[in-house]
Curated annotation (Swiss-Prot):
One of its GO terms (molecular function) is DNA-directed RNA polymerase activity. Its EC number is 2.7.7.6. It is an enzyme of class 2 (transferase). It catalyses: RNA(n) + a ribonucleoside 5'-triphosphate = RNA(n+1) + diphosphate. The gene is rpoZ. Promotes RNA polymerase assembly. Latches the N- and C-terminal regions of the beta' subunit thereby facilitating its interaction with the beta and alpha subunits. Disulfide bonds: none annotated. Keywords: DNA-directed RNA polymerase, Nucleotidyltransferase, Transcription, Transferase. This is DNA-directed RNA polymerase subunit omega. Belongs to the RNA polymerase subunit omega family. It comes from the Bacteria.
Length: 67
């Protein structure tokens, strides 16, 4: 399991504050709504999965406009 760094995530969002908002929303979608992760689960917590999805470019700030 590779570590997720803030720098990896910041390539896909504007700043660290937006990163927190995007990661929080995506983690809740996975944990509460039961959405399927876009990356392999690897026995991680939903917050780590959300950060991995952001770092790999699967999730962007556009998620904030949903719902």
């Amino acid at each position: 399991m590779a570590r997720v760094t803030v720098e990896d995530c910041l390539e896909h969002v504007k700043n660290r504050f937006e990163l927190v908002m995007v990661a929080t929303k995506r983690a809740r979608q996975i944990a509460v709504r039961g959405d399927q992760p876009m990356v392999e689960w690897e026995n991680d917590k939903p917050t780590v999965v959300a950060l991995r999805e952001i770092a790999e470019g699967y999730v962007t700030a556009d998620i904030l406009d949903e719902d």
